[in-house]
Amino acid sequence: MDIFKNRNFVRLFFAALASQMGTTVGNMAFAFFLLDRFSSQPSYTTLAELMYSLPTIFVFLIVGVVADRFDRKKVAENCDWIRAGLTVVLFFTLFTGNIPLVFCILFIRSAVTKFFFPAENSLVQAILPKEHYAKAAGLNQMLFSIFMVFGVGIGAFMYNTIGIEGAIILDFVSFIISGLLIRSCRIPKEARQPNGAFSWRKTSVKDSINDFREGILYILKNKLLASLIFGFFIFGFVNGGFAVLPMFTMKYGLAPDRYEWHTSVFTIALGFGLLAGSVIGTLISKKVKPHFLMSIPIFIAGLLIFVLGYTNILWVYYAAAFALGMCIGPINIAIGGWMPKIVHPKLMGRVSGMQDPFMMFAQSLTLGLVALLFPKFVSNIDYLYYGMGVIILLVFIFYFIALPKYSAQAVEVNVQEAFQEQPKKKARSV
């Protein structure tokens, strides 16, 4: 692939791989450690998971602002150095047995992680030509799929072979490798700081809020961009539903005696589907218009969710999960390849920083609704699938009608020309 001829992208790609490897291995190994060490207190494992998602609430206002105002390369690199340092502290804290302090370190480390993606994603926009954006999104989706399929297995293998201490050391090494790869990138200053030079001394809470508000207004004024950001809300909605529905389906229907095993098989089937869909989506992204690459898989996904609720046959359930994963892959590639073309580089950090909060909010909202409805108000879990399927089909109708119109109205940004603009000049809506 031509994209791998770009040395900066190769380094950023493998930096993201190393960073994701460290995060996945460390998190999963720590979950197994808590289950072994505190088998009578499974709530500890749940609390650890909460430490990975809760920081979003506290930092979402500033992650995008930091990526836009400060040197993006240094932000991404320093995220790795800080996480490596916190991993060392975590290593020694484990020997003290002070679990509340361990949770505190996990919380801080996860909060630092939230700053990595907006900075790294903004750098990718700067170093690639627009025809490579979809390929980059596809490669990132493949990474996510691989860790989704093998993440638990890798974490379990590392925990059983080198123990929690070895897994944390591997965690540390992964962050160091990621930091060194980012440091080795040769990216022009204007691409790293498209808004001009800035320092911590100049910042204030009021300025950060104003910058965040500017990012929100920029999204709302661009109908196509707002529609794409809404796509991440839908991803969160689906993630929230499938975080618990397969488990409930197995426990109360298809396989009550071995529901843990079959829930894992569902996740693997979905992950392999994501991987296959990412490959297919990457290959056809140049031949298919992005609004079709996005809307048609959403329609098929809606129908497949009905199948998941209707079927009483395990292999059909797994096949539908695999096909559903194949639909999600192209949708993500369409969004990831489209967004950098229409977002001004001066605001790319703030736009990227909105993705995780939207997903987390939708995921939390969905989990709350499932907890409220099942089994008190909805005793048959199939109806939850049908409700989700109806919502997805309504989203398809909206996208099928709106995206072609919004796409025709949108103007693509010439990223290289944008970097030549005066730093003090406000970014125009596109």
Curated annotation (Swiss-Prot):
InterPro entries tied to this protein: Drug_antiport (IPR004751), MFS (IPR011701), MFS_dom (IPR020846), MFS_trans_sf (IPR036259)
GO cellular component: plasma membrane
GO molecular function annotation: transmembrane transporter activity
Main subcellular location of this protein, as a coarse class: membrane
Protein's membrane topology: Multi-pass membrane protein
Origin superkingdom: Bacteria
Protein name as catalogued: Uncharacterized MFS-type transporter YkuC
Organism, as annotated: Bacillus subtilis (strain 168)
